[in-house]
Amino acid sequence: MINIQNIQSNNWGSTRISIIGAGKSGIAAAQLGKHLGSEIFISDNNVSPDIQKKIESFRNETGGHSNKVLEAHLIVISPGVPDSIPIIQECREQNIPIVSEIEFASWFTTSPILALTGSNGKTTTVHLLHEMCVSDGKTSLLGGNVGIP
């Protein structure tokens, strides 16, 4: 099992990562994992032909989530994946660490991060904060569900 308390010294080349959700941010997480040398497996219920083409260079499954997901040391979930689906429950039962793709990416940057959560108004607030930073002469990049995954 991966020790998420000691992320920086982890040997990513020997780490198996399952990514649940093959949307824009899931694919970005897969590319980061591949760049780190990790073994990547992508699982999604339903993908478009365009997404299928983007994930063909990774081990993947579509049309459901099999027990292959459970072969991972780390599970990275995309924002649209509900915590309540059976495969997530099985990952928890097996004590496989589960993180969002944003958290996974945050482990590999030294830049300051402004993060927003909540039910309503996140996109508007993120755009407002971005514009405030830019007007103050700061470099600002939008990430997550808006901007760069």
Annotated model-derived regions:
Residues K53-E56, E90-R92:
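Short, conserved catalytic or adaptor-binding loops enriched in Gly and charged residues
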